[in-house]
């Protein structure tokens, strides 16, 4: 039981850290003009596609690590549930508390933290992320069982 709980906790932390590192690195390398639509803080199509790819890869890794630590059982399923429930809760909070578009004009490059705080995504993107994440965890958990 302790291994399962530890697997879920470590898996979630790994997922979070990998996503922060990936998004900050990609934004730093690609810049604001690639990440956002022209003169706005609305995420570009390229950023949205990359975002889903990062979510899938990092959650597969998290599911794999969770399953490896738990050594069997339903820990990856629990982690997938945590990713889905927390992700959807944050999505609901985000859409309820933040306007979809502030019509703020972005001028050139902006620092990473400003980009994160001002970025806007369509609602479907915000709600699809946790679903992709939960699926990734389940895939990673199954990979460990096969290996």
Regions found by a protein language model. Give the residues of each.
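Juxtamembrane/disordered regions of integral membrane proteins
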Residues: 1-147
């Amino acid at each position: 039981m302790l291994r399962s709980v530890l697997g879920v906790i470590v898996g979630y932390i790994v997922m979070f850290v990998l996503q922060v590192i990936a998004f900050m690195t990609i934004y730093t390398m690609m810049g604001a003009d690639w990440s956002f639509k022209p003169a706005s803080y609305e995420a570009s199509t390229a950023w949205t596609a990359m975002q889903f790819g990062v979510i899938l890869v990092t959650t597969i890794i998290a599911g794999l690590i969770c399953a490896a630590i738990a050594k069997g059982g339903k820990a990856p399923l629990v982690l997938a549930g945590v990713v889905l429930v927390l992700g959807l809760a944050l999505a609901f909070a985000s859409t309820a508390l933040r306007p979809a578009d502030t019509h703020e004009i972005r001028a050139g490059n902006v620092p990473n933290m400003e980009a994160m705080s001002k970025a806007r995504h369509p609602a479907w993107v915000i709600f699809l992320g946790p679903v992709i994440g939960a699926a990734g965890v389940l895939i990673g958990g199954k990979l460990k069982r096969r290996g």
